[in-house]
Amino acid sequence: MSKKIRKAIIPAAGLGTRFLPATKAQPKEMLPIVDKPTIQYIIEEAVASGIEEILIITGRSKKCIEDHFDKSVELELELEKSGKEEMLKMVRDISDMVDIHFIRQKEPKGLGHAISCAKTFVGNEPFAVLLGDDIVYNEGKPCLKQLIDCYDEYKTSVLGVQTVEAKDVNKYGIVNGIHIEDRVYKVKGLVEKPAVEEAPSNVAILGRYIITPQIFKILEETKPGKGGEIQLTDALLNLISEEAMYAYDFEGTRYDVGDKLGFLKATVEYALRREDLRDEFIEYLNTLKK
């Protein structure tokens, strides 16, 4: 009997250099899309997918992430005194959303190393990974829940993927796989950021994973790759030789909020989905066309 996916890891130890100077003194994960930090969108997706415990892997200068998801007694008292019940509920809901733990990645040694820091937290269970640079909007089933359902069927690691333009394959980990049923690929190999002419496909890994605990032993044995970092893709490639792996082409609009243009697109489109902002915002956008 396969184990339920209960735990999720969110790596958030990066320096966010692409967003300097905004990220000089605050984590990029706390930059807001409209009025909510990017990392909160990701945690809400995990909770909506049935995740019960989350480990956020942080680096230095990331304490405000912990503060955001902790109780804020002074703020709650002030809102209560002011009779701002709706805001009070919103603030309390953030800290009550899910059981969140934190651990620090002491050195920036890559995504694979960050995942290995979660070994004690995960134990001997399959787990989810949600990367902080990827927000996925879906009106129906959340992206992570789609992967969990695929895991429940195949009982092994599942990569969240979508097709990208051929010219963009050098930005992603690319899947070499066989399409076996609607939205599902059997993974035969992985290539990290290949040259366009060397890419086995245009099926790209996009920030969501379900991984079996066997990955931790492999990560311990994985040698540093590009830039002296331990790459998760290298470890996943070795995992394929030990067990089956699948990729699921998830439904939803994915935003790369680690990229300035992607961040702007997410901000505009999330604002347009807000009933309290949409009409006036559209009016404003229309003035820009003149």
Protein language model features and the residues they cover:
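Conserved N-terminal catalytic core of the sugar/cofactor nucleotidyltransferase
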Residues: 2-10, 18, 36-126, 137
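Conserved core of the sugar-phosphate nucleotidyltransferase
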Residues: 135-217, 222, 226
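Active-site metal-binding loops of divalent metal-dependent hydrolases
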Residues: 15, 134
